[in-house]
Amino acid sequence: MSTSAKTQSAPDQFFSASLAEADPEIAAAIAGELGRQRHEIELIASENIVSRAVLEAQGSVMTNKYAEGYPGHRYYGGCEFVDVAENLAIDRAKKLFGAGFANVQPNSGSQMNQAVFLALLQPGDTFMGLDLAAGGHLTHGATVNMSGKWFKPVHYTVRREDGIIDMDEVAKIAEANKPKLIIAGGSAYSRAWDFKRFREIADSVGAYFMVDMAHFAGLVAGGVHASPVPHAHVCTTTTHKSLRGPRGGLILCNDEALAKKFNSAIFPGLQGGPLMHVIAAKAVAFKEALQPDFKVYAKNVVENAKALAETLRGHGFDIVSGGTDNHLMLVDLRPKALKGNVSEKALVRAGITCNKNGIPFDPEKPFVTSGIRLGTPAATTRGFGVAEFQQVGGMIAEVLNAIAQSSDGQAPLVEAAIRQRVKELTDRFPIYS
């Protein structure tokens, strides 16, 4: 072979070799993950299943492009096509949520929330959020998080008797601490939020009002959850979870001056070049969420969550707050003398994926917990309805009741039988076939 032919073969192979040819180890891991998603029931509330179109956009050549700045104002040339993608994402996000301004560049939920803090707070400023132990989020002032280290968080919580936020108590805490920012939203709160009352409380103490709707944004987009956009100074959301897009963040507001602050906080404040392949995928997901069938999906997510919660209650399980108004629920396992970590592992062995989760006023450590969190978006996306979620609730009850009677937190025969039933159920609702 000539020297010329040899020098040409390397780039030819670089551009033509499949993943399986170039890196069989990673290809095998991806194939394994696809198999897991196909044959397990996904009940982690923060997870979903994206469309093939979203996957295609995220795996596109836009991953090659650097585009520091914003559309029309980049620090690099050659941005005409990524500008098209970002402008489409911005316009679709604004239309989807009825907002005047949108920043689609945050790489994650944590970074979108950090950007709001950077724009509105100074180090040491006081802000309020829902306590992590009551269903809040790390970025809302947990001591281990930047938000809890750089700022002064004060937290509201839920009532012991019913697991619901006491708005009168929120008002008292705000009046006593005069926070500069009040946050509504969390990662494990299953009830509706009173955005109007939160804004009134924020106004009464001169605070900004922020809603982190990362978990329920898809329900807002689908019209089955009240929108915080008319009430909040700023709304943040991840673009995955119930919104069913790629992993990333989004900032929404209706005030141009604030929008400029948030833009500056993202770039150059926190990030450099945005992930243009992810922004393209966000645009695709927002277009999907603007279609009529997304409203059907959102309605089904809530109906399925209520069905799952009621089924578990019927099997003697305690649901924190007594039920759910959205896509998720917390199961209090203490009446069954079970721990969250043991229950999570048993359900995974049975083909049902969920996560251990602290419950309000949980006496257990975070890696043990007294509860599990369940959510319905992913299984709803693959086609499960109320009947299927009633079956799933029964399967969960069988596994948990079996391990409650065992000495080592395992019930191999029951787990194996349920795993076979899970496979039969998931085979009826294939993904990426």
Curated annotation (Swiss-Prot):
(6S)-5,6,7,8-tetrahydrofolate binds at L132, G136, H137, L138. It comes from Rhodopseudomonas palustris (strain BisA53). CDD domains: SHMT. The lineage of its organism: Bacteria, Pseudomonadati, Pseudomonadota, Alphaproteobacteria, Hyphomicrobiales. The gene is glyA. GO terms for biological process: glycine biosynthetic process from serine; tetrahydrofolate interconversion. Pathway: One-carbon metabolism; tetrahydrofolate interconversion; Amino-acid biosynthesis; glycine biosynthesis; glycine from L-serine: step 1/1. It catalyses: (6R)-5,10-methylene-5,6,7,8-tetrahydrofolate + glycine + H2O = (6S)-5,6,7,8-tetrahydrofolate + L-serine. This is Serine hydroxymethyltransferase. GO terms for cellular component: cytosol. The modification N6-(pyridoxal phosphate)lysine is found at K241. Its EC number is 2.1.2.1. Its main location: cytoplasm.
